[in-house]
């Protein structure tokens, strides 16, 4: 192929990669679970065989596990950040191949960035593990105890700055106010982009450092998106269920987005407010899915362009099951997030292991076919204990819940295009006709 032809192909691929982001059509996919590191032959190699199915389902971004050496097998206790070959998921060459395969299908790769804390390779003169090795032959990321927050007294030498966020007891909390820490972490993030091919970030335990510090790393590395895990407890009643009013919870998430730069920033948050409310709502309390202003009750209702919605992830579900979605109602959860505003995230387990691949893909197809975006208009038509019905952009209607007699609230001119266990989706006649012809 000539030079001009190669340039043309590259430009087309770049347009494909950027299309979802520019238009708000992102559909995320978490490409691992808590047990993925155990995969025989390596997780990255196994995932090579899943790329076609993921891309065919309309996914725009795949979130991959932490890429570096880690004291814990899962990757969340990182040490030598440049040492990719030591990962339990596979080596650097295998990771590059996987990212290349994703890019070849127009799908971006999200790196799981764990920078709140870090594990040291060596002890200092006190016998404390606080001497860090970066994983290169030079001094990059080779830090000492003066890079550990001084209020992390178990590890620090007392000379650094105070922690800007929540404590992480299991490993040293890194001083993100330190100029060298900021500079070398930004260099590492840029290397993840330039050398490995990553496009975007998922910020692990983002409560551990201030949003102002997150802004430094987002602004300094220009990811296509940076979705943060800011997981706080929800206010609950005496029965253990979440209170109806979760405005304080979602306000905290909105505040994080504001402080990293708001609409101008690539920063966004996982919508833990929606997750918690939806968990409870599908148990016969679907009245929860509307706030007093008639909007969705999570971050989705206030700032949908910055709300990454999800049913479960490697922490809430998988084998950890810290906060699992009701297992017999998972597809109700997907019917909700895949038809609604916000940026939905599909979990690997539900797609590949639970037998929901075709149903989830059908819902994504409806989303794409009707041009539903992160900021689509939501009109809630019914919100009772056993039935929730909503219209999106005047093009799609969705019902979740056990009640079947909801025909009276379905607008004229809509026909059923997807249905399953206690959920159904309708499209306008024109969209349904297009589906039948295709």
UniProtKB/Swiss-Prot annotation:
Monomer. Redox-insensitive. Ca(2+) 3 binds at residues 152, 167-168, 171, 173. Changing residue 404 to A: Reduces affinity for starch granules 9-fold and reduces activity by 90%. Abolishes binding of starch granules and reduces activity towards starch granules by 99%. GO terms for biological process: starch catabolic process. Changing residue 129 to A: Reduces affinity for starch granules 3-fold. The record marks 315 as: Transition state stabilizer. GO terms for cellular component: extracellular region. It is found in: Secreted, Extracellular space. Optimum pH is 5.5 with p-nitrophenyl maltoheptaoside or amylopectin as substrate. This is Alpha-amylase type A isozyme. The keyword Calcium applies. Its EC number is 3.2.1.1. Its main location: secreted. Its cofactor is Ca(2+). Ca(2+) 2 binds at residues 133, 136, 138, 142. Alpha-amylase displaying a robust amylolytic activity toward p-nitrophenyl maltoheptaoside (BPNP-G7), amylopectin and beta-limit dextrin.
């Amino acid at each position: 192929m000539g030079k001009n032809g190669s340039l043309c192909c590259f430009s087309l691929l770049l347009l494909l990669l950027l299309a979802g982001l520019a238009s708000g059509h992102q559909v995320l996919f978490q490409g691992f679970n808590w047990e993925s590191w155990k995969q025989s032959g390596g997780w990255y190699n196994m995932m090579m065989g899943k790329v076609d199915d993921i891309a065919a389902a309309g996914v725009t971004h795949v979130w991959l596990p932490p890429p570096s050496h880690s004291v814990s097998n899962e990757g969340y206790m990182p040490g030598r950040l440049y040492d990719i070959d030591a990962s339990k998921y596979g080596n650097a060459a295998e990771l590059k191949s996987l990212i290349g395969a994703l890019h070849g299908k127009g799908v971006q790769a999200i790196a799981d960035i764990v920078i709140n804390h870090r594990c040291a390779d060596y002890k200092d003169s006190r016998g404390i593990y606080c001497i860090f090795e970066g994983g290169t032959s030079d001094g990059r990321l080779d830090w000492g105890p003066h890079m550990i927050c001084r209020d992390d007294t178990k590890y620090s030498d007392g000379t650094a700055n105070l922690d800007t966020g929540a404590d992480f007891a299991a490993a040293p909390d890194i001083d993100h106010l330190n100029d060298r820490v900021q500079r070398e972490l930004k260099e590492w993030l840029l290397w993840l982009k330039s050398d490995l091919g990553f496009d975007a970030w998922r910020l692990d335990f983002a409560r551990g450092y201030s949003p102002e510090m997150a802004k430094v790393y987002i602004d300094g590395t220009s990811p296509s998106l940076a979705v943060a895990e800011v997981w706080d407890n929800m206010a609950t009643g005496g029965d253990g269920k979440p209170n109806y009013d979760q405005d304080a919870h979602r306000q905290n998430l909105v505040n994080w987005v504001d402080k990293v730069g708001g609409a101008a920033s690539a920063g966004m948050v996982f919508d833990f407010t929606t997750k918690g409310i939806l968990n409870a709502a599908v148990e016969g309390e679907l009245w929860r899915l509307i706030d007093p202003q008639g909007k969705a009750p999570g971050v989705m209702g206030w700032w949908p362009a910055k709300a990454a919605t999800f049913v479960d992830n490697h922490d809430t579900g998988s084998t950890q099951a810290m906060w699992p979605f009701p297992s017999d109602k998972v597809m109700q959860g997907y019917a909700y997030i895949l038809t609604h505003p916000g940026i939905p995230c599909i979990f690997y387990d539900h797609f590949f292991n639970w037998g929901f691949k075709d149903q989830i893909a059908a819902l994504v197809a409806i989303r794409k076919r009707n041009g539903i975006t992160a900021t689509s208009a939501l009109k809630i038509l019914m919100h009772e204990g056993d039935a929730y019905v909503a219209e999106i952009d005047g093009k799609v209607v969705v019902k979740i819940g056990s009640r079947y007699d909801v025909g009276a609230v379905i607008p004229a001119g809509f026909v059923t295009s997807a249905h399953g266990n206690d959920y159904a989706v309708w499209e306008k006649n024109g969209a349904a006709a297009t589906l039948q012809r295709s």
